[in-house]
């Protein structure tokens, strides 16, 4: 997320990359407030960047407050503007969103999903919030503030398994079903499916979409 934080360093790095003419393709993660520059995005594309992952996390202000995300990175209009600029520069936009945040209910989760649809990134990733041991959030859960842990097995601590249950959910299956619902709601929109079909430019694109479609069917339908 910090690659583009220092603008001077980033511009110098990109200039060197372009001058070296290495013809490399690369991706990165970035915070919204660090790429608020059209020229920087264009230079990133010229140097070979084809994809940026933004961690938007949620579309609900109170949930963002609960996990103390940077206010500069959760302004909806700014998210929308930077996403538009990134696409205009010829760079794909991938966005990450969380379900099962502290203070969340199914109704609030659906607001986050709606935010994802309105922001309309090229690809969206929805994962279950996983409070790792030793973090502030994990400590608060241990104190009974937001919900309860349902496992302490470190093998389960990843973004795909439910390790804790917020008070707003009845059980882990309800939370996991919300994650599945998010993927279906985002990816099965007719407008989205049509746009991806029209974006096909090569056989590699077809193979990539088939692979992604299989993963969607297997994991979330």
Question: Which role does the model predict for each range below?
Answer:
Residues 4-7, 12-204:
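A structural motif corresponding to the C-terminal lobe/cap of the Radical SAM core domain
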């Amino acid at each position: 997320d910090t690659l583009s934080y220092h603008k001077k360093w980033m511009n110098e790095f990109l200039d060197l990359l372009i001058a070296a003419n290495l013809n490399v393709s690369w991706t990165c993660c970035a915070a919204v407030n660090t790429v608020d520059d059209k020229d920087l995005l264009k230079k990133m594309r010229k140097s070979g960047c084809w994809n940026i992952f933004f961690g938007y996390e949620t579309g609900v202000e109170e949930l963002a407050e609960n996990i103390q995300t940077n206010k500069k990175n959760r302004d909806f209009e700014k998210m929308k503007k930077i996403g538009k600029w990134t696409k205009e520069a010829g760079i794909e936009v991938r966005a990450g969103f969380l379900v099962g945040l502290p203070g969340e209910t199914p109704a609030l989760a659906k607001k986050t999903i709606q935010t994802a649809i309105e922001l309309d990134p090229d690809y969206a990733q929805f994962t279950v919030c996983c409070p790792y041991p030793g973090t502030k959030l994990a400590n608060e859960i241990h104190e009974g503030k937001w919900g309860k842990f349902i496992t302490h097995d470190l093998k389960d601590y990843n973004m795909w398994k439910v390790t804790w249950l917020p008070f707003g959910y009845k059980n882990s299956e309800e939370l996991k079903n919300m994650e599945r619902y998010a993927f279906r709601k985002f990816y099965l929109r007719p407008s989205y499916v049509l746009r991806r079909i029209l974006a096909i430019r090569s056989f590699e694109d077809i193979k990539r979409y088939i692979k992604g479609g299989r993963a969607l069917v297997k994991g979330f339908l």
